[in-house]
Amino acid sequence: MGHNWECANFMTLTSEVDGSSRDFVIVGAEGADRSHPNSIFTEYPQPVTKFPREERSLQWMCGRLRADHGMARPAPAMDYVCGSKFDHALMYGVNSFHDPQSGKQIAYGWITEEDLPQPLIDRQNWSGLISIPRDLSLVVVKNVVGALNSKLEDITSLELELESGGTYKARTLGISPSHKLEALRGGARHVKVSKPHALSLASRIGLDVQTCRFELFAAFQVSDHCRRIGFSIYHTQDLNPEFATSIYLETESETLMIDRPDSSHVDPDILTFSERAPFTLLNIMQPDGSIQREQLQVRAFFDESVLEVFANDRCTFATRIYPATKRVWGIRFWADDDSGHSELLGSKAWDGLRADIRVQ
């Protein structure tokens, strides 16, 4: 959890599913103990680079606030229940506030420019930017019986409550794009895939997205035989995968990945290693007693060199990519699944988002 905390946020969130409430703290954690077995820098080590990223991260913790009477005067204390990273890439310094109009807790953060060498930062005369607003919530999933591979009790981002039928109620922090961002869609070109399609590595199912300013939503059904599933954003006309951005789930390792395009043509010192985060899909018991895996739902916002990704409203990335061109040559959906049972259930995109309007 780092050697120093800064930009701390405290909040109480209430679920719309069952009315339960939990206390949360979001902190910027500076420094890291690389020798600790649970260090994020040990589990997901960075490649050797000329200028590695700062050893800092955004963390959230869920617990129960109480009064500690073990001191001369009662002091507030929190019993830790669960936690994870608030963002798994470059976001830092988050602050949040309660929006009286929507009743939601809204968070903003700083997306840094650590992956650019200093000469390029100096040339552009600015560094970093503010993220899109994120709605925070207490997510509650009922009737959970398992995950892709991990035991439920080993998933440290979940609070588990045993239900009467032997299933579990799982709670975690929900992080989703603010609904107010829908105002940016005005005037954008709407493209979609309406029907389910079986996916393979050779699939040609895609969306005709052309600009570097778009919002994307995609829903997938992931089979037991699937090894990887996701989509690729092409930045060159020849659809060269080396210069594409690929966002996908590795099911065996339960890891969500973002492979960023090669930017050595711009500057060999730009960092383009893959972003990764622990992520799994939950298995849920249905009223008829059958077990159904939840969908993989991905939302992505791309704006020139900024990519923000949200998976199932509980795993997020805010990263930077520096593509070869200032446009996109489409998005293709695919799966590494020989059975043909993994599907794209549907997708839609708003291409050419406007940035010159005021979001109310």
Report the location of each language-model feature:
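Beta-rich accessory regions
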Residues: 31, 59-360
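Gly/Pro-rich turn-and-neighbor structural signature
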Residues: 1-101
